[in-house]
Design a protein with these regions (language model features):
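Internal nucleotide-binding/catalytic subdomain
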Residues: 156-293
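Generic C-terminus detector
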Residues: 367-372, 376-424
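Solvent-exposed alpha-helices and their adjacent loops that cap or buttress functional pockets
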Residues: 20-21, 36-38, 60, 90, ...
Length: 424
């Protein structure tokens, strides 16, 4: 069969790699793809938001199955367009992708269906928000309602910081229309854990847990980013936590969406906070995380096409989802200055060191070919250096070893990815 993957990051590279392992797939296309994905798929110069062109391409090339990696096209309704054209497409429709597309919607959903989450208020008026903050308890969290590349969340320790945050989100519109509505949420303390799942509208199957590192700098300092590294599984995601989440969060979310007339098909990413009062939902994403996909998909034993088709066909209950009893760590190599200002276009060397090594992998995120055919940097997050091992400590040591194999001029990384492994 022919498969089209939509997106251009490390997550899509991980999806393409999983698809390439499927015995059912003869040909992979990726739109727009990147320099690393080009080794596995034919990259097509169509942007992820160019729905008409993507649908035409899928029709013209007799694509059997399309996988949407990114949040923007999902929230924009790309799956609806593919389905209207009679094409099979993996991901939630527009009315279900709102689970990620609007934080106000997801908070209201959790409140209505008693899914554990932080206390909150939604605001569409900056003056009302400021008035509310006058009597609030700090620290407090401000969230832009819409998509903001994972950067629309501000933790404010004082009233002054909160006032500045309201200005940033609602008045200066730093995140554009994503800030038309703002969620003010109680600050929760505990460990953050990500859990990925496959969903077919009624059945949910949990993949594995992972732990992200959002801040740009060592010691969780600096600005929020899309994610600087990850490890899977999380040692803090215990059987007890799993039991609680299965009872009160996972199926409850799928059932809530179905009851609202928004059946969810695709991947739900649960961002959880393990608090003293038990696990609570921090956020939902309507797709694989990045770099969560890079540490979870390499551990999956199943043929990804079998699982994704079952989601689309509503037969996920027939799938026995299985994962290797191992560990995986990803360290992101970024451009110095990310997530604010950074230079691009630097030549990258050392890729050949990964050749023939099953347990090491270099996922490409912000890369492209220059006019001379060299692979150069083309984004803030450039590569995801990933390694598997029998234990988290072994996988971490191997991933950091492999970060030395690749060189480019403004290479930057965190040196403490997986520090929490030592605290487990």
């Amino acid at each position: 069969m022919k498969v089209l993957v939509v997106g251009s990051g490390g997550r899509e590279h991980a999806i393409c790699r999983a698809v390439a392992k499927s015995s059912r797939v003869d040909k992979i296309y990726c739109a727009p793809g990147n320099a690393g994905i080009a080794a596995l798929a034919e990259c097509v110069p169509i942007g992820a938001m160019e729905f008409d062109k993507l649908v035409s391409f899928a029709k013209d090339n007799a694509i059997d199955f399309t996988i949407i990696g990114m949040d923007d096209p999902l929230v924009g309704g790309i799956v609806d367009e593919f389905e209207k054209a009679g094409l099979k497409c993996f991901g939630p429709k527009k009315n279900a992708a709102i689970l990620e597309g609007s934080k106000a919607f997801s908070k209201d959903l959790m409140k209505k269906y008693n899914i554990p989450t932080a206390a909150y208020e939604n605001f569409t008026d900056a003056k009302e928000a400021l008035k509310y903050l006058e009597t609030a308890k700090f620290p407090i969290v401000l969230k832009a309602d819409g998509l903001a590349l994972g950067k629309g969340v501000l933790i404010c320790n004082t009233l002054e910081e909160a006032k500045e945050g309201v200005r940033t989100i609602m008045e200066d519109k730093k995140f554009g229309t994503a800030g038309n509505t703002m969620v003010v949420e109680e600050f929760m303390t505990g460990r953050e854990v990500s859990v990925l799942s496959f969903v077919d509208g009624k059945t949910i199957k949990i993949m594995s847990s992972a732990q992200d590192h959002k801040r740009a700098g060592d010691g969780d300092t600096g600005l929020n980013t899309g994610g600087m590294g990850n490890f899977s599984p999380s040692p803090f995601y215990t059987d007890e936590v799993d039991d609680f989440c299965k009872k009160y969060i996972y199926q409850a979310t799928v059932d809530a969406m179905a009851k609202e007339g928004r059946p969810f098909t695709g991947v739900i990413f649960f961002g959880l906070m393990l608090t003293e009062d038990g696990p609570k939902v921090l956020e939902y994403n309507a797709r694989f995380g990045d770099p969560e996909a890079q540490v979870v998909l390499p551990r999956m034993k199943n043929d990804i096409i079998d699982v994704m088709e079952a989601c689309v066909d509503g037969t996920l209950d027939t799938i026995d989802l299985q994962f290797e009893d191992n560990a995986c760590v990803c360290v992101v190599l970024a451009s110095y200055g990310y997530p604010v200002k950074y230079e691009k276009g630097f030549k990258i060397t050392g890729f050949e060191k990964f050749d023939g090594k099953e347990d090491y992998y270099c996922y490409h995120a912000g890369t492209k070919f220059d006019a001379d055919g060299n692979i150069v940097t083309n984004g803030g997050r450039v590569l995801g250096i990933t390694a598997t091992g029998a234990t988290l400590k072994e996988a971490r040591a191997k991933a950091y070893e492999a970060t030395e194999w690749v060189q480019f001029d403004n290479k930057y990384m965190r040196h403490d990815i997986g520090k929490a492994i030592d605290e487990a």
